[in-house]
């Protein structure tokens, strides 16, 4: 982008639903571009679901041409099988923008919540409400899309050499 403007895609990885949100940042000014949710077929074999997730992300990346990507880190839950499946989806979510030539930064959920809401233990409803305040034209239809916009906002606030170096490791 020109004039110091950068287009950022935020991604909230999931095997059932992956949220994406695109914003433009110029200095401290943030502008909503688009958001949505990719829904791989739930009853399809794992490889097919991952392939559909990749296809959907590649389409979004081609349509919105972001300059940088940011992905929310995932947490390990009590069910090892669920954690492994989420890890596979997260791998695809990180791969697609990297294949498109983008740097991919990662942010912990706690930092995303603290950046957007001001509290690391914020609820989903608080995140969605603050996204409406920060990006008045945004109309995320799912929590996943709202979370993805929150990841993009976090990247806009925390990006820079350190975040991009972490992404390159």
From Swiss-Prot:
It is found in: Cytoplasm. One of its GO terms (cellular component) is cytoplasm. GO terms for biological process: DNA recombination; DNA repair. Gene3D superfamilies: Ribonuclease H-like superfamily/Ribonuclease H. Its cofactor is Mg(2+). It catalyses: Endonucleolytic cleavage at a junction such as a reciprocal single-stranded crossover between two homologous DNA duplexes (Holliday junction). Mg(2+) 2 binds at residue 72. The active site is at residues 12, 72, 144. The keyword Translocase does not apply. InterPro entries: RNaseH-like_sf, RNaseH_sf, X-over_junc_endoDNase_Mg_BS, X-over_junc_endoDNase_RuvC. Keywords: Cytoplasm, DNA damage, DNA recombination, DNA repair, DNA-binding, Endonuclease, Hydrolase, Magnesium, Metal-binding, Nuclease. The keyword Magnesium applies. Its EC number is 3.1.21.10. Its main location: cytoplasm. Pfam families: RuvC. Mg(2+) 1 binds at residues 12, 144. GO terms for molecular function: crossover junction DNA endonuclease activity; DNA binding; magnesium ion binding. It is an enzyme of class 3 (hydrolase). Binds 2 Mg(2+) ion per subunit. Belongs to the RuvC family. The RuvA-RuvB-RuvC complex processes Holliday junction (HJ) DNA during genetic recombination and DNA repair. Endonuclease that resolves HJ intermediates. Cleaves cruciform DNA by making single-stranded nicks across the HJ at symmetrical positions within the homologous arms, yielding a 5'-phosphate and a 3'-hydroxyl group; requires a central core of homology in the junction. The consensus cleavage sequence is 5'-(A/T)TT(C/G)-3'. Cleavage occurs on the 3'-side of the TT dinucleotide at the point of strand exchange. Homodimer which binds Holliday junction (HJ) DNA. The HJ becomes 2-fold symmetrical on binding to RuvC with unstacked arms; it has a different conformation from HJ DNA in complex with RuvA. In the full resolvosome a probable DNA-RuvA(4)-RuvB(12)-RuvC(2) complex forms which resolves the HJ. This is Crossover junction endodeoxyribonuclease RuvC.
